[in-house]
């Protein structure tokens, strides 16, 4: 198994992004990416870029493998706000999937405000989508 390589010396920093070189191959080394498949891959890549908050600095998409140079920002102090989380979820999920999460977050916030729960309620909802 290959060893992970760090491209930035500040990998453990809480205020600077980390940069990774990623490579993934198609199963059985088949030539799976034609013109349409490459365009579909680009679309999904950009969707997940918006969802994750990461930034694709560069990429090379070939017929049977992909290289990405990915910038991963540090997690915001205190994590994402509820609004920021819902905005990211809307980048990859249809409205019908995001509405129940918004409702669950609102209910958790109400319980916290009423003194019937702790911040852990909302944190657990956030961690389902933002765990690193």
Language-model-detected regions and their locations in the chain:
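Short catalytic/metal-binding and nucleic-acid-binding patches
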Residues: 1-132
